[in-house]
Amino acid sequence: MEYIKPHKGFSTLIILGITLGIDLIFSLLSTFINTYIVLRILEIFIVFFNIYQLYYILKSLTLKYCYDNENFYVLWCFGIRRVTIPFKEIEAYNVSHGEIKGVKLWGYGRNFFALGTFSVNDIGIVNMFVTATKNVIYIKCNSSIYGISPEKCDEVKNFLEKRKLVLKNWTYEKRNKVSLSKDRHFDILIFLISIVILMVTIIPFILYLRGVMPHKMPLSFDSNFKPMIYGTSREFAFKHMMYGAYNMIIFFCIYYSAYFYARYSKKLAYRLMYISFLVAFIFLIFQFKIYVTYIH
């Protein structure tokens, strides 16, 4: 197994700086926010944000390349995560220098580094493992394209050429519009999100119509879940119906965004739908906490 050292740029420092900056902004904002549901959503966002950031910091720090007689490997997270690229599936390779010309679909960087999924001009949809954009090698396979940034670019070019792989440009054929209507994974996500939003919207009305709620119900809470404003059970039901409406708006926006991203990658479309599910689920948990506390 031969190892190739990636060109280490400033990717780790940039991601770490963004992480600390966003965490600082959140800490400052949290001192001024006194609304329970808003603060809980922000707290959950910052938890997932820091997990996301930590993943890319580890990816940047631990990324390395290697190869044997059969495959080229991209390793990160201490070898726990890897991509295997069989040489027999490689069709060609290309080289670029400097800023990535294209659109970031998911991940980090563009100017100085690129980690994640990018739509690169004249190349295609690329899985980027690039810690510095000084020298980027694009490896085109049967069904995927990968971007790497070796410290010694000529070394990689030489062993690719020894395997009779040529340096050439290729035509990027844009994908046709992707239909998600028959995608089982996508359909399950839509079903789950719809059920959660329906529960957020309908359950308060059912409880109100059945007379289960007390006449006086809290309408808003401070950051410690202490009621700030009280109203009638009818006002409570209508207020939470509006929460359901807000979630429907978020869902439809994300739904159409998912169709756009599906042209590049279905995985990106799924991730967007999970965001909608998470937001709706937070509102549902918030409601159940109110029911448990104030309905006896």
Curated annotation (Swiss-Prot):
Bilayer topology annotation: Multi-pass membrane protein
The question of whether Protein biosynthesis is a record keyword is answered with: no
Cellular component terms (Gene Ontology) = plasma membrane
Lineage: superkingdom:
Bacteria
Q: Which UniProt keywords apply?
A: Cell membrane, Membrane, Transmembrane, Transmembrane helix
Query: What InterPro entries does this protein's entry cite?
Result: Bacterial_PH-related (IPR027783)
Q: Which residues cross the membrane?
A: 10-29, 36-58, 112-131, 188-210, 241-260, 273-295
Compartments annotated for it: namely:
Cell membrane
Q: What is this protein called?
A: Uncharacterized protein CA_C1301
What Pfam families does this protein's entry cite? bPH_5
